[in-house]
């Protein structure tokens, strides 16, 4: 059986890409370095701002950049792709139509894990970009898992969240 090669479609921000690689490495049971999973990362910080695209309706440049980066991973041999950017998941359906490699839905997996950890009917706090909130990605995924999403109730809190998320990362 050949090994599965993981692709990381990253750069949004670069530290998130590095953090995912570290987490994959730390969670892989390995007695020697050869036991680790093969991971290919394309950290492309030139992908346009996802929140701006969602709020302005100019989504095609983001879709094109995500697809180009995913195709790079596909050509490099990735057999599954992960995207360590919540807001980029608003473009997941479009991206899946443009590449053959399966792409993990981080939002869906988060909702499944929340249900497993806290049980159906639980309330889940949600801090996210304006774009992620507007698309209701997490709200819908959590509702499908019979959970309730609650985001910031005051604009000042959401502004503070955005200030934090907009820092260089």
Regions found by a protein language model. Give the residues of each.
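Non-catalytic structural scaffold of enzyme domains
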Residues: 1-169
């Amino acid at each position: 059986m050949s090994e599965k090669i993981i692709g990381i479609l990253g750069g949004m921000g670069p530290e998130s890409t590095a953090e995912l690689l570290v987490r994959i490495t730390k969670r892989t049971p390995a007695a020697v370095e050869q036991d680790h999973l093969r991971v290919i990362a394309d950290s492309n910080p030139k992908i346009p701002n996802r929140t701006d695209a969602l709020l302005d309706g100019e989504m095609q440049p983001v879709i094109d950049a995500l697809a180009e980066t995913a195709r790079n991973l596909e050509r490099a041999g990735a057999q599954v792709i992960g995207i360590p950017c919540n807001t980029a998941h608003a473009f997941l359906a479009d991206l899946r139509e443009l590449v053959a490699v399966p792409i993990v839905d981080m939002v869906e997996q988060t909702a499944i894990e929340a249900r497993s950890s806290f049980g159906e009917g639980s309330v889940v706090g949600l801090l996210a970009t304006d774009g992620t909130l507007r698309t209701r990605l997490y709200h819908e995924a959590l509702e499908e898992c019979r959970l309730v999403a609650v985001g910031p109730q005051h604009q000042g809190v959401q502004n503070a969240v955005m200030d934090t998320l907009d820092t260089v990362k």
